[in-house]
UniProtKB/Swiss-Prot annotation:
Any Gene Ontology CC annotation: cell septum
Active-site residues, record numbering mapped to chain: 66, 84, 118
Stated name of the protein: Guanyl-specific ribonuclease T1
Keyword Hydrolase recorded: yes
Signal sequence interval, chain numbering: 1-26
UniProt cross-references to InterPro entries, sorted A to Z: N1-like (IPR000026), Ribonuclease/ribotoxin (IPR016191), Ribonuclease_N1/T1 (IPR051386), RNase_U2 (IPR048269)
Enzyme Commission numbers on file: 4.6.1.24
The reaction(s) this protein catalyses: [RNA] containing guanosine + H2O = an [RNA fragment]-3'-guanosine-3'-phosphate + a 5'-hydroxy-ribonucleotide-3'-[RNA fragment]
Subunit structure and binding partners: Monomer.
UniProt cross-references to Pfam families, sorted A to Z: Ribonuclease
Disulfide bonds: 28-36, 32-129
Family, as annotated: Belongs to the ribonuclease N1/T1 family.
Keyword Nuclease: yes
Length: 130
């Protein structure tokens, strides 16, 4: 009897467990190279960068957040000036050290301009994440 209940429970839960990877894939709102970010990841990174910008503080040897000049000519839907801030594939908020390849770009009004990456770009340029 107990074995039968356990088998039934396992049979019911197994399809749900197998479906979980597809749920994770659907949470990918931005793809930068092979890195996947949810809107929540982007919002968290943006909030951290904007708070430092507002406080007049920076972190890391490249002094993030710093002005982003948009030399690539991206057609952002929000007005400049723009600032760039690292978004880390680990999910951690950047606090110094290697910034990785990916950035959130926001403006003076804390509006998200876009998510960009050095991955797949030539030299020190950026390409837009999809």
């Amino acid at each position: 009897m107990m074995y039968s209940k356990l088998l039934t429970l396992t049979t019911l839960l197994l399809p749900t467990a197998l479906a979980l990877p597809s749920l994770v894939e659907r949470a990918c709102d931005y793809t930068c190279g092979s890195n996947c970010y949810s809107s929540s990841d982007v919002s968290t990174a943006q909030a951290a960068g904007y708070q430092l910008h507002e406080d007049g503080e920076t972190v890391g040897s490249n002094s993030y957040p710093h002005k982003y000049n948009n030399y690539e000519g991206f057609d952002f839907s929000v007005s400049s000036p723009y600032y760039e801030w690292p978004i880390l594939s680990s999910g951690d908020v950047y606090s110094g050290g290697s910034p990785g390849a990916d950035r959130v770009v926001f403006n003076e009004n804390n509006q998200l301009a876009g998510v960009i990456t050095h991955t797949g770009a030539s030299g020190n340029n950026f390409v837009e994440c999809t």
